[in-house]
């Protein structure tokens, strides 16, 4: 969504508040990993990244390597790419991909074949310093990740590839925003069942699972990192189990074009998805959206 003739205002102080608020909740020994995929949820990734640096956040995660390229040379971020990097058999890395992986980017690895192909592509590209990888475990989301029983074998493959270095193991909650759901404790146990033995071999292994809701409602000091998403921007991850004390950081302002006075029962906008319940004063502004997402948010 692009606001035409409108202004998107980002509150630095509110973002700082949300960062500090979540950090206090998870404990000062747990690292915050800011989710800044999709242009920082539309807030502007370059500006948000700079504010996060000021706030002391040292980790960020994005969806794809393409998103990571924009941030790869920022020296204060460790950047985790959540989507597995897919390389075809015999495939090579582009120049931009090479530059990103020479920066602070970490890659998600979910199977042996992908690990071997990535290592080969790095070898062909002349990498001398290993790229750090995080292994994603399918703890019950049933979407992306290696099954728990296969983690040990995958780790052995990574250990035998000099172009790769295991840095972390992680999973995603299926119901992280519903703290009392049965799957929350079950999936935490699954992750610990594979990560705890690995910590004996890799003492500095980073283990992470929680999203915004999970970080607030589930305290687990044994986890090293929490991936905070929309809570940083002051948005609620769940309406049924809200995170207390968040402050929305964004505001859109725009000039008013027209003002109408209409009686109760007046339909407004495309499809009349809003109907006045009382005599109302309505205005139209210059902030307009033309994308599909904007159509969902704006009533015409």
Spans of features found by a protein language model:
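Active-site anion/phosphate-binding pocket segments in diverse small-molecule metabolic enzymes
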Residues: 1-12, 16, 24, 67, ...
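Active-site-proximal beta-alpha core segment in soluble small-molecule metabolic enzymes
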Residues: 2, 7-9, 30-208
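Nucleotide phosphate-binding/pyrophosphate-handling subdomain across enzymes
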Residues: 16-33
């Amino acid at each position: 969504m692009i606001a035409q003739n409108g202004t998107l205002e980002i509150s630095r102080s509110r973002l700082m508040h949300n960062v500090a608020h979540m950090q206090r909740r998870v404990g000062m020994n747990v690292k915050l990993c800011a989710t800044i995929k999709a242009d920082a949820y539309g807030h502007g990734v370059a500006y948000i990244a700079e504010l996060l640096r000021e706030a002391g956040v040292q980790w960020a995660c994005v969806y794809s390597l393409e998103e990571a390229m924009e941030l790869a040379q920022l020296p204060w971020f460790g950047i985790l790419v959540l989507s597995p990097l897919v390389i075809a058999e015999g495939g090579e890395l582009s120049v931009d991909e090479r530059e990103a992986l020479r920066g602070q980017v970490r890659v998600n690895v979910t199977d042996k074949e992908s690990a071997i192909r990535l290592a080969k592509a790095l070898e062909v590209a002349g990498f001398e310093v290993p790229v750090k990888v995080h292994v994603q475990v399918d703890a019950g989301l049933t979407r992306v990740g290696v099954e728990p029983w296969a983690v040990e074998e995958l780790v052995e493959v990574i250990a035998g590839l000099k172009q790769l270095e295991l840095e972390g193991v992680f999973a995603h909650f299926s119901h992280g925003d519903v703290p009392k759901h049965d799957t929350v404790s079950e999936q935490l146990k699954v992750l610990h069942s594979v990560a705890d033995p690995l910590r004996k071999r890799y003492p500095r292994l980073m283990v992470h699972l929680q999203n915004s809701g999970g970080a607030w409602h589930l305290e687990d000091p044994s986890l090293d990192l929490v991936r905070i998403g929309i809570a940083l921007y002051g948005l609620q991850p769940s309406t049924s189990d809200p995170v207390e004390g968040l402050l929305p950081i964004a505001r859109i302002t725009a000039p008013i074009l027209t003002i109408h006075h209409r009686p109760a029962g007046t339909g407004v906008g495309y499809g009349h998805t809003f109907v006045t319940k009382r005599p109302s004063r309505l205005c139209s502004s210059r902030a307009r959206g033309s994308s599909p997402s904007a159509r969902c948010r704006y009533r015409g």
